[in-house]
């Protein structure tokens, strides 16, 4: 982690008092809950931290590396979009004790993660407490150089801060921010002492935060009772007196101005402010679209620039969405088009599937084909038929690619989601290789010695757990994938078992390593003589299996009826115990990974693989090829990730 950079606090210098004014409408809600202290009511129980302002590329593994330097981390979860799996920019870090959380906020708050300062706060699960306006203040006219850290340091002198945020966009600070204090008294003190002061040579306004709903209601009320009128398309030869006389007949005017340039020439627009709203409304109704000295006037309520831009943005988005909806499912994207093809020849190829509304091959400025284009049909059914018939068709000995057209941002999100999934898989494989707890999907560790025989129709009862895995039925803490523990961390009260190497111990299997500790009982006591040891071969002969036990109850001879009585997790465990020995017979070194990949198949197909050895062998070979191909393609990325410099923090 990069070293923590603490911006110098904005210097507060007294300035002459400024009249209290209504705060400008804020585009963002204030951040809440970010700070150094918690409410006393939560002090004893809360160990969960909210970490915000994260770069989308930040993963659970990166956060664990950072926060584990402070104390024992129970779990980490980066919140992601349910569809694209793209990071939402915030995460939750759970410590085992509150003291570690306190230290994490003191030492890591506003520190840089991927060159972006993070914001850390205690997780507040009660939305009523998160949205309360008590102790929340609004600051505007901030200098562009003031960031979250500088704002926090400036206002920390008045009380415990629960939240501190400067509103920003892609270009930087928006010039306003929010500070949420623990008490209303601290907020009042901050308003009293800082309102009208100079921060970085700019006079700031500090007042109580007004919730968005109240601000919006006040704005709507102001718009409905407007008195300021805007007029454009005014003839350049019109004088100020003529312009004012035009509006005087509608009521008393408090101000009237016709905008002019530096040379004194009229810009063709101006503003008229009436004393009464009804008079202003009457002027708009009668003068809009009227003729004045040969020009058709445009007269309407005067708007702020930000309001006009917002209306234009909304209208643009509405037109854009309407256009996208119109072509949704009917516009096709084509690539690998032969250079000899033109628009007409391409249209002839796709005409048999329906009515084409447009067909175009994209070309360079020189007129040379760029090899891709678009075909738009009148109905989705026609487009789907064209995709199924034309995708992969050979045109001039070149396979044509045909698919539904997608927007660039949608394609980018899908690509980012795919890259993120590959990175997660690589991190899980690295974690498995380094003993960082049991990996997520794609790796399978059998129970040592498998499960002993169970009565007919009963699901297995797990007695032992592999390294980093809790027995079934216990809650799993989130870390990347559900149930995965970071960096070998184990829940308190569980002892990790040694993961199996190669195939499960059986007759002729690998012997325990030199210096291995002797077998122990469940509670660590020496195992009584004669008691079977998990993972060791059972005695041969009639005593190896209880008398009268049906063969179908043995692992490897599972039935659909037995699996139907088990939960999905138990079904996978039962099938894994049956499949693993068969995979290990041919691939002892990769049995765990290959079994994990095979277990992703549906249960019905897994039962078929247990019955048909040839089908299982074919599936093992297929999984082996996929694994080798992935390892070859991903080796460069794994090496870069391993060599990445670890960021450092300082208090």
Curated annotation (Swiss-Prot):
<feature type="region of interest" description="Disordered">
    <location>
        <begin position="481"/>
        <end position="554"/>
    </location>
</feature>
<dbReference type="GO" id="GO:0005634">
    <property type="term" value="C:nucleus"/>
</dbReference>
<keyword id="KW-0963">Cytoplasm</keyword>
<dbReference type="InterPro" id="IPR003954">
    <property type="entry name" value="RRM_dom_euk"/>
</dbReference>
<feature type="domain" description="RRM 2">
    <location>
        <begin position="135"/>
        <end position="211"/>
    </location>
</feature>
<keyword id="KW-0813">Transport</keyword>
<dbReference type="GO" id="GO:1990904">
    <property type="term" value="C:ribonucleoprotein complex"/>
</dbReference>
<dbReference type="InterPro" id="IPR006515">
    <property type="entry name" value="PABP_1234"/>
</dbReference>
<keyword id="KW-0206">Cytoskeleton</keyword>
<dbReference type="InterPro" id="IPR035979">
    <property type="entry name" value="RBD_domain_sf"/>
</dbReference>
<dbReference type="InterPro" id="IPR000504">
    <property type="entry name" value="RRM_dom"/>
</dbReference>
<dbReference type="GO" id="GO:0005856">
    <property type="term" value="C:cytoskeleton"/>
</dbReference>
<feature type="compositionally biased region" description="Low complexity">
    <location>
        <begin position="1"/>
        <end position="27"/>
    </location>
</feature>
<dbReference type="Pfam" id="PF00658">
    <property type="entry name" value="MLLE"/>
</dbReference>
<dbReference type="GO" id="GO:0010494">
    <property type="term" value="C:cytoplasmic stress granule"/>
</dbReference>
<feature type="domain" description="RRM 4">
    <location>
        <begin position="330"/>
        <end position="407"/>
    </location>
</feature>
<dbReference type="GO" id="GO:0005829">
    <property type="term" value="C:cytosol"/>
</dbReference>
<dbReference type="GO" id="GO:0051028">
    <property type="term" value="P:mRNA transport"/>
</dbReference>
<keyword id="KW-0967">Endosome</keyword>
<dbReference type="InterPro" id="IPR034364">
    <property type="entry name" value="PABP_RRM1"/>
</dbReference>
<dbReference type="InterPro" id="IPR002004">
    <property type="entry name" value="PABP_HYD_C"/>
</dbReference>
<dbReference type="GO" id="GO:0008143">
    <property type="term" value="F:poly(A) binding"/>
</dbReference>
<dbReference type="InterPro" id="IPR036053">
    <property type="entry name" value="PABP-dom"/>
</dbReference>
<feature type="domain" description="PABC">
    <location>
        <begin position="555"/>
        <end position="632"/>
    </location>
</feature>
<feature type="compositionally biased region" description="Low complexity">
    <location>
        <begin position="636"/>
        <end position="651"/>
    </location>
</feature>
<comment type="subunit">
    <text>Part of large ribonucleoprotein complexes (mRNPs) containing RNA-binding proteins RRM4 and PAB1, endosome-binding protein UPA1, core scaffold protein UPA2 and associated factor GRP1. Interacts (via PABC domain) with UPA1 (via PAM2 domain). Interacts (via PABC domain) with UPA2 (via PAM2 domains).</text>
</comment>
<keyword id="KW-0677">Repeat</keyword>
<keyword id="KW-0509">mRNA transport</keyword>
<dbReference type="GO" id="GO:0006417">
    <property type="term" value="P:regulation of translation"/>
</dbReference>
<dbReference type="GO" id="GO:0005768">
    <property type="term" value="C:endosome"/>
</dbReference>
<protein>
    <recommendedName>
        <fullName>Polyadenylate-binding protein 1</fullName>
    </recommendedName>
</protein>
<feature type="compositionally biased region" description="Pro residues">
    <location>
        <begin position="529"/>
        <end position="540"/>
    </location>
</feature>
<feature type="region of interest" description="Disordered">
    <location>
        <begin position="632"/>
        <end position="651"/>
    </location>
</feature>
<keyword id="KW-0694">RNA-binding</keyword>
<keyword id="KW-0810">Translation regulation</keyword>
<dbReference type="Pfam" id="PF00076">
    <property type="entry name" value="RRM_1"/>
</dbReference>
<comment type="function">
    <text>RNA-binding protein involved in the formation of polar-growing hyphae which is essential for infection by the plant pathogen. Component of endosomal mRNA transport that regulates polarity of the infectious hyphae by transporting a broad spectrum of cargo mRNAs from the nucleus to cell poles.</text>
</comment>
<comment type="similarity">
    <text>Belongs to the polyadenylate-binding protein type-1 family.</text>
</comment>
<dbReference type="InterPro" id="IPR045305">
    <property type="entry name" value="RRM2_I_PABPs"/>
</dbReference>
<dbReference type="GO" id="GO:0008266">
    <property type="term" value="F:poly(U) RNA binding"/>
</dbReference>
<feature type="region of interest" description="Disordered">
    <location>
        <begin position="1"/>
        <end position="42"/>
    </location>
</feature>
<dbReference type="InterPro" id="IPR012677">
    <property type="entry name" value="Nucleotide-bd_a/b_plait_sf"/>
</dbReference>
């Amino acid at each position: 982690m990069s070293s923590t950079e603490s911006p110098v606090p904005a210097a507060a210098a007294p300035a002459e008092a400024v009249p209290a004014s209504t705060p400008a409408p804020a585009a963002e809600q204030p951040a809440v809950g970010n700070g150094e202290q918690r409410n006393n009511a939560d002090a004893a129980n809360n160990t969960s931290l909210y970490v915000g302002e994260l770069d989308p590329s930040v993963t659970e593994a990166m956060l664990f590396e950072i926060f584990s330097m402070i104390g024992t981390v129970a779990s980490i979860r980066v919140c992601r979009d349910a569809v694209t799996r793209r990071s939402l920019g915030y995460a939750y870090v759970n410590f085992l004790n509150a003291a570690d959380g306190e230290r994490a906020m003191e030492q890591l708050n506003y520190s840089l993660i991927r060159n972006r300062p993070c914001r850390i706060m205690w997780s507040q699960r009660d939305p009523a407490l998160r949205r309360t306006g008590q102790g929340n203040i609004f600051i505007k006219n901030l200098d562009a150089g003031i960031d979250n850290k500088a704002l926090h340091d400036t206002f920390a002198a008045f009380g415990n801060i629960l939240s501190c945020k400067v509103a920003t966009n892609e270009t930087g600070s928006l010039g306003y921010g929010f500070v949420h204090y623990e008490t209303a008294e601290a907020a009042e003190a901050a308003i009293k002492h800082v309102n009208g002061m100079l921060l970085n040579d700019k006079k700031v306004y500090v007042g109580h935060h007004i919730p968005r709903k109240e601000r919006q209601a006040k704005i709507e009320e102001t718009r409905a009772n407007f008195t300021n009128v805007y007029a454009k398309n005014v003839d350049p030869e019109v004088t100020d007196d003529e312009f004012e006389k035009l509006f005087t007949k509608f009521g008393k005017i408090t101000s009237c101005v016709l905008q002019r340039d530096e040379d004194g020439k009229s810009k063709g627009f101006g503003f008229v402010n009436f004393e009464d709203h009804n008079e202003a409304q009457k002027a708009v109704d009668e003068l809009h679209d009227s003729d004045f000295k040969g020009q058709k006037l445009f007269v309407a309520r005067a708007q702020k620039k930000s309001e006009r831009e917002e209306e234009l943005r909304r209208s643009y988005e509405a037109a854009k969405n309407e256009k996208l909806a119109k072509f949704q499912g009917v516009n096709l994207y084509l690539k690998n088009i032969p250079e000899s093809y033109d628009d007409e020849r391409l249209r002839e190829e796709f005409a048999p599937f329906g009515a084409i509304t447009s067909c175009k091959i994209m070309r360079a400025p020189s007129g040379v084909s760029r090899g891709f284009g678009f075909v738009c049909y009148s109905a989705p059914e026609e487009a789907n038929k064209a995709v199924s018939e034309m995708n992969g068709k050979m045109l001039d000995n070149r396979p044509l690619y045909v698919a539904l057209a997608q927007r660039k941002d949608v394609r980018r999100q899908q690509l980012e989601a795919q890259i993120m999934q590959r990175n997660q898989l690589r991190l899980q494989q690295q974690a498995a290789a380094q003993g960082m707890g049991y990996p997520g999907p794609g790796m399978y560790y059998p129970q040592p010695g498998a499960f002993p025989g169970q009565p007919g129709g009963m699901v297995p009862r797990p007695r032992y757990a592999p390294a980093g895995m809790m027995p079934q039925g216990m809650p799993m803490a989130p870390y990347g994938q559900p149930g995965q523990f970071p960096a070998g961390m184990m829940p308190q009260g569980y002892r990790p078992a040694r993961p199996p190497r190669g195939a499960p111990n059986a007759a002729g299997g690998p012997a325990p390593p030199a210096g291995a500790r002797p077998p122990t009982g469940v509670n660590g006591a020496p195992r009584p003589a004669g008691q079977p040891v998990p993972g060791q071969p059972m005695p041969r002969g009639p005593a190896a299996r209880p008398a009268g036990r049906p063969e179908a109850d043995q692992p490897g001879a599972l039935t659909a009826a037995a699996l139907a009585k088990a939960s999905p997790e138990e079904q996978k465990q039962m099938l894994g115990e049956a499949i693993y020995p068969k995979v290990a017979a041919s691939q002892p070194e990769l049995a765990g990974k290959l079994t994990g990949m095979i277990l992703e198949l549906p249960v019905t197909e897994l039962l078929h693989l247990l019955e048909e050895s040839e089908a299982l062998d074919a599936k093992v070979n297929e999984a082996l090829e996929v694994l080798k191909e992935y390892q070859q393609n991903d080796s460069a990325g794994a090496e870069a990730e391993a060599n990445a410099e670890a960021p450092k923090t300082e208090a």
